[in-house]
Design a protein with these regions (language model features):
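Short C-terminal boundary/hinge segments that cap the last helix of small helical domains
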Residues: 31-47
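Helix-turn-helix/homeodomain-like alpha-helical modules used for DNA recognition
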Residues: 42-102
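Alpha-solenoid helical repeat architecture
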Residues: 39-44, 77-83, 115-123, 135-143, ...
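"A position-specific structural signal for the A-helix of alpha-solenoid helical repeats
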Residues: 49-53, 83-91, 119-124, 140-148
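Alpha-helical repeat scaffolds
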Residues: 60-71, 98-113, 125-136, 156-168
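Short alpha-helical DNA-recognition segment
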Residues: 1-10
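DNA major-groove recognition helix of helix-turn-helix
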Residues: 11-12, 22
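DNA major-groove recognition helix of helix-turn-helix/homeodomain DNA-binding modules
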Residues: 19-36
Length: 172
């Protein structure tokens, strides 16, 4: 069966790659609708790659963010969950120095968003990313480090995070 302990253990340790159909079955048993539509995931991956490219070169990301924000619920329950959380954390971590689109936060909160709502969303999102840190690849960890560098107030800690960003992105 799909819940054989040794198979699940191999997946947890990263020594086995689960088939998407098996993942979908596992999540279904937990009552979660896991997103496996390859066309949707491919399109979303391209949009996330565009977001990260724009970020690296200082280009506008509003349009890409709005497309991805519209897919938030589906992406959270997909293999791209870390990436969409990174995209949203990066986007909203910029709110300290530039105007950001609050409509996504408003739709989550079901009311007009203010700075505290953005901060609460960021805190919750970063808290989840902290728990997912061991699952991140080098590039994801670099973007996670970027978020952490933006959110910390301590200059020494900020520099440590920036060095992790630089190290992680120089290899991509």
């Amino acid at each position: 069966g799909i819940c054989v302990v040794s198979y699940l253990s191999k997946i947890e340790r990263g020594s086995a790659e689960p088939d998407m159909a098996i993942l979908k079955q596992l999540f279904a048993r937990l009552g979660i609708n896991y997103e496996t539509d390859s066309a949707f995931l491919t399109e979303s991956r391209k949009q996330m790659d565009e977001f990260f490219y724009n970020l690296q070169y200082g280009l506008e990301n509003e349009t890409v963010w709005k497309k991805l924000a519209g897919k938030w619920d589906r992406l959270l329950m997909s293999p791209l969950t870390i990436d969409i959380r990174l995209v949203s954390a990066i986007y909203y971590s910029e709110s300290a120095w530039k105007e950001v689109d609050k409509s996504f936060i408003e739709s989550l909160m079901k009311k007009e968003a203010d700075g505290n709502d953005i901060q609460n969303f960021l805190n919750e999102n970063v808290s989840t990313l902290v728990r997912l840190e061991d699952c991140m690849d080098e590039k994801q960890y670099a973007y996670y480090s970027l978020v952490c560098s933006r959110l910390t107030k301590d200059p020494a800690e900020k520099m440590e995070w920036y060095q992790k960003v630089q190290h992680g992105l120089q290899n991509t």
